[in-house]
Every structure is written in C-alpha cells, then in structure tokens.
Amino acid sequence: MGSRVPIETIEEDGEFDWEAAVKEIDLACLKTTNASSSSSSHFTPLANPPITANLTKPPAKRQSTLDKFIGRTEHKPENHQVVSECGVNDNDNSPLVGIDPEAAKTWIYPVNGSVPLRDYQFAITKTALFSNTLVALPTGLGKTLIAAVVMYNYFRWFPQGKIVFAAPSRPLVMQQIEACHNIVGIPQEWTIDLTGQTCPSKRAFLWKSKRVFFVTPQVLEKDIQSGTCLTNYLVCLVIDEAHRALGNYSYCVVVRELMAVPIQLRILALTATPGSKTQAIQGIIDNLQISTLEYRNESDHDVCPYVHDRKLEVIEVPLGQDADDVSKRLFHVIRPYAVRLKNFGVNLNRDIQTLSPHEVLMARDKFRQAPLPGLPHVNHGDVESCFAALITLYHIRKLLSSHGIRPAYEMLEEKLKEGPFARLMSKNEDIRMTKLLMQQRLSHGAPSPKLSKMLEILVDHFKVKDPKTSRVIIFSNFRGSVRDIMNALSNIGDMVKATEFIGQSSGKTLKGQSQKIQQAVLEKFRAGGFNVIVATSIGEEGLDIMEVDLVICFDANVSPLRMIQRMGRTGRKNNGRVVVLACEGSEKNSYMRKQASGRAIKKHMRNGGTNSFNFHPSPRMIPHVYKPEVQHVEFSIKQFVPRGKKLQEEYATETPAFQKKLTPAETHMLAKYYNNPDEEKLRVSLIAFPHFQTLPSKVHKVMHSRQTGMLIDAMQHLQEPTFSEQSKSFFTEFRAPLGEREELDTGLRVTNDPKDLHSVRDLEVNTSQRKAKQVESPTSTLETTEKDYEESSPTHRYLFSSECASVDTLGNVFVMPVPLLFFPNVLESDNTPLPKTEKQHSCRNTSHIDLVPVDTSEKHRQDNISCKLKERFSPDGASETLETHSLVKRNSTRVGEDDVANSVGEIVLSSDEDDCEGLELSPRLTNFIKSGIVPESPVYDQGEANREEDLEFPQLSSPMRFSNELAGESSFPERKVQHKCNDYNIVSTTTELRTPQKEVGLANGTECLAVSPIPEDWRTPLANLTNTNSSARKDWRVSSGEKLETLRQPRKLKRLRRLGDCSSAVKENYPGITEADHIRSRSRGKKHIRGKKKMIMDDDVQVFIDEEAEVSSGAEMSADENEDVTGDSFEDSFIDDGTMPTANTQAESGKVDMMAVYRRSLLSQSPLPARFRDLAASSLSPYSAGPLTRINESRSDSDKSLSSLRTPKTTNSESNQDAMMIGNLSVVQISSDSRKRKFSLCNSANAPVINLESKFAAHAQATEKESHEGVRSNAGALEYNDDDDDAFFATLDFDAMEAQATLLLSKQRSEAKEKEDATVIPNPGMQRSDGMEKDAPSFDLGLW
C-alpha cells in the first residue's frame, strides 16, 4: 500500500517520468526485506500536498535546458492568449507580466527604404534579443537601430511589460526618443521622456500609464529606490554610453537594485569605446551583468561595405622657441620637488621629464593606500605637499606643450593667487622668473604654432570644398583654447562662420552653454548657419552632430577612447579626413603610446572577448517552446510630434464640491444643460477680422488703454493700403488720433440722444492720408481731394474742449464763456484753387447759423449765442468779411452734404465791441496797467500794429484738434486779420483771450467722457496763425512733417531776468523804436558781451532782485548766463508764453507756479513803494499768462514809450477787453535771453533812480499819489540809463530793508479797508484796485 500512493499520485500528472518510476518499482521488488522502508523513504515526499515542488526539481541527469527557465503550473490561466511567465521560485516577487504566444512566434526586423539591411546589425540584434549584450560599435554604425528593434520586439512580446531606455543627458534622451520612433514607429501614446525636469508625483503617474520610457540614469535610480518605478513589470533595459558604467555611477546602482529583485530582465548596453584597458572593460561587464560582447570596427569584413574612407593625418607641430624656453624654466621648478620625493622613498618609475599629471596622481594614490614603511608620520605632510606641487606643475607643462603659452600662463597666475600651491611657491624664485618669462613672451605676441597650422588647414580645406555645404569640427580639450581658436577664426574672412559648443558648467574665464543653447547651435549648424564648430569633449559622444568633412584635433594628448569618438564624427556617408595636431616632444610621444595601447585592446575584444573577459549568465526571457522566427516588415511610421513642456491632455481638473453631492440623475441633467468651459475654450483670433481691429469700439466712462491704442496703430500700419478714409475718420472722431496717443486731452462728448443736438448734426472730418503741397508763396496752401469730403454715418462730436468745460463732483457740467466754434467750412489760401468736382460749393450755405450751447446743469444755464455770418460774394475777387463774436462756442453744426464736400473745419472769429464793454479788469491787473512796469517776456514774431496779415489754416483731422491748436496760439486785442483768396477775402476781428485751463472731473452716469485727439506728429504744413511777418523766426513756425513738442512738458525753472535785458533787446532788434525814444540823452556806454564780463550800466541804479543771492557783487557771470542777442529761443525764457500750440493742456492749469509764489513773497517784503509791489504782484504765471502785447501810451510830456502788457486769459474777460483798448498796438519782437536769466522788474524804459536809504518814508507816503499818476510817473524814468546792479546792491543794508518792509506792511493792514473801496480810474474804461484784502496775511505767499 505504501507504494500505491505515490503511483496513484503520479498518474494524476500527465507529464510523469515513467522510466524513473519503473526503476523504482524494480528496486522495490528486488529488496523485499526492506521494501516498505525503502519505498516509503523514497516516495514520502511525493505524497505531500505540494507535489509540483518535486516535479519541478527532478534529478539533474533528467533535466533539459528548457527546465532551467520554465516552471510547470498546476492550472492553466483563463486567458489563452497570454501565458503567465513564472520564474524559478513561486513567490510574491515573481514577474507580473505575461507573454503573448502569438507574438512570440516571430520577431520583427524593419526593412524600410531609409533603413537598409546590414548584416552586422542583423546579427547583433538577433543575439541581443535572447541574452544580455554589450554592443561596441564605432560612432555612426547604427547602434540606435539595434536598440530600437530589440525594444519593439519586447514591446510586442510582453503586452503589459515596460521598457526603459537610459541616456546620460537630457539632449540625448530627446534625441533617442525621436530616433527610435522613426525606425520602428513605437506609438507615441505609449512613450514618454522622464528627466529631472519632471516632478516626482507626475513621474509616479506616468510609470503606471506608459510603457516605453526614455530616462536619465539619475532619475531611474531615484525612482527605483523610492518605489515609484514598477520594477516587477520591467522586461527590457537599454543603456546608452555604457562605458560610463564604472564605480558608483547611476548605471551601476540601477542594475544592482534590479538584480536584487528576482525578476527576469533583458539588458542591452551600447557604446562606441568600451575602454582603453582590459580592467575597465571587465568592470563594465560585471556591473551590467553582460553575457555577450559584440564588437565591430571599420576593418571587419561585414562593416567595410558601409564605412567610407577615413584618412587620418598626424601633423607634428614644432613647439616654438618661446614655449621651449618656458618649458625648460618649468623643469627647473619641477626638479627639486621630484628629488625630494625620491629621497622620501617614493618611486615614480619613470624619467621626471616624461611624467604626466595622471601618472603623478596614480603615484599619490598608491602612497596613500600603502605609506612607505619606515617613513615617519610627520613627513607625510611634506610628501603630500610635494605631490600637490608636482601635479600642478606637470599640468601647466602639459598645457604649455598642447595649447601654448597663454593657457599655461593663465593657469599659473590663477594658482598663485590663493591655495596651497600659492603658499608653497610664494618664495620660490624659479617660479617667479618663469612667470616673468611668460609675460615677456606674451607681450610680444607669442603666436601659437598650432593656431597658425590650424588656420592653414582650414583655408586649404575651404578652397577645395564649398563653404556653404562643407562642415568642420575642431576639438579642444581645454576651454581656454576654444576662446583662442575663436579669436583666430574671426580673422580668416567670411568663408568661415564659426561658433563654440561647450558644456553647461561656467568657468572663471568662459561661461557655459545651457542645453537650449546647445540644441540651437546644433540646429543652426545642420541648417548651414555655421560651417565650423569649436567643441570641447561634449561634442565627442552622444549628440548627433551630422556628417562632417573634416575633424581637427587641436590637442592629441587624449585617451584612445576619446580619439575614437572624435574620429567617428566623419567618414559616415562620405569620405572623411581627421587631422591631429601634435606638438613635438611629449605630446606626440604620448599620442603614439596611447594609440598602441588602443590597438592592443582591440585584439582582446576579438571573437567576443571570450578569451579575455568573464561573462555572466542571463535568462532567455522567451521560453524554449517558442522559437521566434524573423519577419522583415516595412513599417508605415507616422510623423513624430515632439511633446511640449506642458501636456494639456493630462491636465487634471478637480471636480467641484457641489457635484460630489449630486445624484447621477442630477449630474446628467447638469451636464446636459451646462457646457464645461474647460472643454470648449474661446480662442480669440487677432487676424480673423482685421478691418474691425483698426477702429476702437465705443466706450462709456472707461477709456481704451494705451496698449489697445498701440495694437490699433499696428493694425492700421499693416493695412495701410486698404485702410479707408472713412474708417480713419471714424477712428479720429471716436476716440483718439491716428498718430501717437501718449498724451491725450480729455473733453466732453455728446451722447447719441437726439435731444442733445437739436439743430446740430455730427460731421465727420476725414484727415488721414491728406497731403499738403508746398508752394513758393509765403503762405502755404492746402490741397484736398474729393475723397476727403465724403460724408459718413453720424458719430459722436466733441462740442467743447477740456479748457472750456469742467465737471464737479455732483456731475454738473460747467461750460466756460469763451469756447471756440468751428464750422464745417474751410478757408482756402489765395494760391490754392478750389477742387473742381461736382461737390464744389461756396460758403454761402452757412450765412446764418444758430448755435446751441450744451448745458447739462439746471443751475448753470447759458444763453444761446447767435453768430451771424455776413457774406458777400463777388466774382471779380471782391472780399468777403466775416464778423464773429468774441465769445464763441465750439459746436457741431447742421450742414448739408454740399457743405461737407468743401469743408474740413472752419474757424469763425467775430468781434463786437458791445460785447466787451462790460468786461472788468481785476484790481491787480488794473494796477498792473497803470504802473506800466511788467516783467519782460518773449512774444511771437509780430509785425507792426494794424498791419494786414495773411492768415493760414492748417489741415486738421477734427475740430477738436484744431481748437487745441488755436488755443495755443496768441491773439491780439482789436486786431483785424484779412485772409486773401482767389474768390473771396475774409477780414475778421478777434479779441480772443487766453483763459487758464481747468481740470475736467469725472462725469455722472448720463455723460460720456472722450479724449480729444491731439497727435504728436503732423504731416501738413502749418503756418503761424498769428503772424506771417517776414522777420519771423523759423523757430516759431511748424514746418511740414515737423514733430511738435510733447504735451506735458517738464517744468522749466529759470533764473530771474536781469534789469536792462529787455531794453537792450529792444534797442538792438528795433533801432527804429530806439530812435523814436528821443528822451534818451545818451546811448549805452558798454554793450553786453559774451564771455565772463559783467553787464555794466552807466549811472542808473538797477532795481534788481537776485534769486537767493546766487550772484554777488564780486562774482562773475558764467558763460551760460551771457545774453544771446541774436537768438529767438523764447522757449528758454523764464516766463512761458504758451508759444507751443500743442503744449496747452489741462495739467498746466493745475500746476502751482512756485516761481510766481517766490516772486510775490520776495517782493512783499521789499522796501519798495507800494506801486512797485503791486506791479510785481501783477506778474503772471508762465502757465496762465497769455501772449505779450505792447501798448503805445500818450504821455502828457509828449513822450512815447513802450510798456509791456501781458493779457491773461481769465473769466473776467470784460475788464481784460477794456484794458486792451487803451491804445494802438505796436508789436515788438523781443529776443530770448540765456537759460540762466535773472528776472528783473523792468519795462522797455529805464527804471527811476530811488535812494532807498533816505526816501523809504517819502515813497511810502507818495504811494497813493504815484498810483494815481500811473504811466506818467514811469515816463520820467526814460531819461536815465541802466547802471551796474551789482555795485548798487553792494551798498544796500538788507536788515534795514527788512525792518522797513515790516513797517510798510503794518501800515498797509490799517489802510486795507479804505483802499478796498477806493477806486481811481486814470483813463476811461479802466478800474483800479490795489488788491489788498481786509484780512491779508503779513507774508504774501503769492497764491491768487
């Protein structure tokens, strides 16, 4: 019975070994005595439940090769398509992947047209599929194809398996993923690249979702150690640049980690040079568990058909006398330290003249591992210091022999700065002399023989080869030489386009290149942007640097491994040439020695290295029951799509919290009626509707940004040929000009409500692409086309500029009483014929127009002002006279289409004396006029009074633009301007007054704010609207195409004007006025001269106030204070006359005139009579002052003098009108002074002589009387001349002046109330007030 149990159990197994069982039965029958014991002892294990355990381990003599790799299972898997693969041991760490039996019957080899079938590649691939293989092939012989085919077949065989391709750098990873795709077409949805730039959490997700991974060894090592990498699913590992697998490099750590897990893994290692020594190659085999070595070189019979001729040339370059001298000097430094080492017992085993830095390093390591016996421990430090000095010195000597004197000198200088070498050599005389010798040689140039030879080789090469198609690589092991080579190549000429290709690490002398820059350099090199690359060791391996025709090795003292890598860059598709530059002596000898050792290594690797190396067993991975047969397949490969930095398809969206609480039915309903914005993202196209992007959209309150304006300008510039006039006019009227928008003037814009425009219709003025023609006549003409007058749909119209309207905090709109009105007619200059079109009409259609002012406030309503246009037309050239009111408003008018045809924007200027009778002058201005003393200020170039002038109007794009221009121009009281035309003459009298501009506040919700278009650049000829006198300077005329001043000009603070400057300017520029001034008895003694001389007056005491006492009586004037008597640079004067048309903005009204504050406060403390203080207080701000005019006053003594009058533009326009009707105008042009001009209270006449020491009281008492006399008191001063102001102030007692000023101010407070009611009118139409208030402060701050 004991024997039946195992027999019955064995019968249950279909694969029972019957022969073994029969022998056992026979033995049991023969030994009947102990049959029970013998049978039970042998068959007892078979009766145990785990029967398959014994069956999987039968006696060794009965086993076949198949039993080593395949384990029997008791139950077959349910999936008949994939058979589970079990290892030798059944445990939890067994592989979790199964093999596809159908796919395992074949293995695929590509036969695409771009991938020719090569015998050596096919043979190596067949071997690598079934064993761990080290493939050693020279560069360019197709190692990547072998790896791609192996990866693809394992991808087919194991549907759940994962394949890893490891490369030492990120560029190589990206390069290999594309190469493998182009060879076998592994689907991209299964491939991914994992580098250090991928976060660990994302890598964990990718390890589960992908199957083919291209990684760096460092990332693979970290993921395996952290458990992120699913090692149980790995079936194939490809290692590129396998010669790095030494020591504890990541390749070695990864393989050790994987071998610790009981898995079956296929390893394929690729390299061009496994090593230069047998020990190194054996180390690679051990670290990577290699079973087979596949080695090929260019001389093998199966490789020769695919390798082109590669010519190797070794050129011996003489070291040079200079380098030889330095080498001998260095040897004198080396000898003492080598002798000391020998005395200590260290054996260097070679002549010290032929030693290399590497050999010294090996000797030091040997000494550290086994110190010399008998050597005292205290001497170990001396031995180490000698080794350190020799290593540095031999390295300097190597640089000297390989690269020249300059790299050697730079290294020596760096080492002598700090560190142990510097401390050891600080007192060494030989090293100091060596450094001095290097400096001397470098000062004389010290050309490197290698550089000269290299340039010669390059020039000869490009004479034979086409520089556009030929490529050259120059290898240098030292970065310093890369710089020298680049400098030398820059002197060859245009045929050489060189660039450097170096590593990422930045040194002290040369900055490294990032991987992005490296890829860009290689791409440009392939495209032909460069034809020469100067590379360090980074260009030797790995990267695909296309086929080159010539390889130049600038240094020959490199290992055979690296030399093979360099040589592999040429001779792939065409014949190649390799030139090695070796200096005579040590460098050439070292090169020859290393080449000999390389040839010996090749012999060891012959026939797979079976006689020289020990290999490791590896699993077959494919069971023996499957015998895969090759199947040549032509792949249809899709185009490779590089993956971006961010995978949008992997964007993880978090489910909203409310959806987690919904039922499935509610979620379905929500998805039915709600579109997820993440699914369909709106992508606004910037080129879909280009026409609409040339115009801004309508806005309310919130204006378009500056960036929007820039975009619109760019779109208009791109569509210039197709950009219509109508579109441009729409753009101009709606938001901003077609030009620059850096500074914009804010104004009001009328809404679209028809009730706001009862009798006014929007008129669109087209200005884009208008061209002005320059003619020879003094007045420029305007040329318009029919297209310019096309009428478009109504748009918004600017009714008022910012200077005419303001908005308070409650939203009430206040319109100033002096806006400007523009009609849709244009004035043609006399030399311009009217356009002969069908739409040509005269101006008679607008003979009478009612103007409706805009009023949005119930409390501030204004009466409608009616302007009558009186028009006379005569065919023979009779003149038409247009009389307009002085108070006009800017508005849009209802005109017919016929009027639009000939209109650009007409200015209607009216004059009515009745309207100006009620004007009142301010008390300060009254005193200002009476005294006749005003600060000197430049004016426009003006002719004589009452002269006829030709008035020109510029081409403007909109009334708003023209209004700002006109507001910037000066105007004159009671001035008639006659404009001559071919068909009509227009004579207009204008009394336009400048008014300080007000800041426009925010409007209420019912109003729209717009921006007044004021372009910075005009391309139309502009004439001076106030004067076209022939004596006018060009500085005051804006020529065609001339860029105007920017709107917000920086404030210019000038020094005060000196007394006498005005009078000297009048005398020199207007000799006629000087002659008419017969009161002057003598001329000036000395003229104002450039240089360092002071301006000297004769006898008169100058009333002068020095700004903060900068110029004393003994100080000299600087060169920039000299008076420029010939210049008209009025923009540099202290007082701004608003001469620039475009410089009048709202910001000017908001500025505080600190110089006016200073001037008033200073004069309020001076001991001058009250009339001078009042006059000084009447001086105006450079930001609010209007144009300067001259008034000829009739004197009682029949004297005539000129006194300056600044007419400020204030709301009190009636008083200003009366003030300006004093007499006839005489326009005087005053030249501008220098930039540092001091201000002085002076008029065109001389100041009176005042004895300030003795007559303060007398003048104080006579203040009121002198104020009554007004201009007469000033006339008597004309008989005096100017005197030296510095000498005058040298005699003043300022303390007494301050005391007297305090006394005078106290008297003024007591008399303030009486003076406030007293009004003295010296001339009809003028009023007088001293301007002192009841509660005036003791110190006048100058704020009004």
Curated annotation (Swiss-Prot):
PROSITE patterns: HELICASE_ATP_BIND_1, HELICASE_CTER. Involved in ordered homologous recombination (HR) events in somatic and meiotic cells. Involved in the suppression of spontaneous HR events in somatic cells. Has an opposite function to the DNA binding cofactor MHF1 which promotes spontaneous HR. Functions in replicative repair independently of MHF1 and in a parallel pathway to the endonuclease MUS81. Acts in the same pathway as the two DNA-binding cofactors MHF1 and MHF2 to restrain class II meiotic crossover (CO), and acts exclusively with MHF1 and MHF2 during meiosis to repair DNA interstrand cross-links (ICLs). It comes from Arabidopsis thaliana (Mouse-ear cress). The lineage of its organism: Eukaryota, Viridiplantae, Streptophyta, Embryophyta, Tracheophyta. Residues 39-61, 765-790, 1110-1148, 1183-1218, 1307-1344 are annotated as: Disordered. Residues 1207-1218 have a biased composition (Polar residues). GO terms for cellular component: nucleus. Disruption phenotype: Reduced fertility. Its EC number is 3.6.4.13. Residues 1118-1135 have a biased composition (Acidic residues). A motif (DEAH box) lies at residues 240-243. This is DEAD-box ATP-dependent RNA helicase FANCM.
